[in-house]
Amino acid sequence: MSMKTKSLLIVALGVLSGNLSAKDYLLSTPNTSLLITANPGEKSKYQYYGSRISEKDIQGIYDSSLAFGVESYPVFGVNTAGERAMAVTHADGNMSLDLVVEEVKQYTTDEGEMMEIRMKDLVYPFALKQIFKAYKGTDIISTWVEVENNGKKPLTLYRFASAFFPVHRGDNWMTHFHGFWGAESTMDEEKLTNGQKVISNKDGLVNTESDNPS
């Protein structure tokens, strides 16, 4: 997967094309496709992102080594290895989450296509929606999550990423922006190497006056 394609992949993944069965959801741009499985009672998983595919190609993805099989929103709890998108402490002090798909909704708005994957914890009254919004006439999908604490007592969120996406080893590039007063939005492109890449600033609420990394 190359970050030099026309499709935006920070939290942007393609144009929603609809579910193919009870669990397969294919999102496509003119040049790329994203395949997600979201079967009720199971983990929601990314299965493929790369060159554009059609419905008839899906079985070939599963039969090959191309399928990701990676949770679309991994949380700290039962499985703790690897990077987690969310970590919480419940009112009783337990730090475990075990989210499974409850339902998936797709609908259209004036701005584009929407897909909501609602997940619930198997023990606690905790739910999460992973939302994808495909804007009309673009190659952009924004994605974010909404958290629901349906218990009577508060819980503490220690980590809450807006998105999680796996990147397979390869010739992958990242485009990002930085700057300072009078020279904002300077674009950089760099090849992704092993390890983590962190883009941040410490200016807090005044970050748009100087360095605003993205």
Residue ranges and their predicted role:
Residues 1-9:
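Bacterial N-terminal signal peptides that target proteins for export
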Residues 12-20:
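Hydrophobic h-region of N-terminal signal peptides that target proteins for export
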Residues 23-36, 40-214:
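Polysaccharide-binding surfaces and accessory modules of carbohydrate-active proteins
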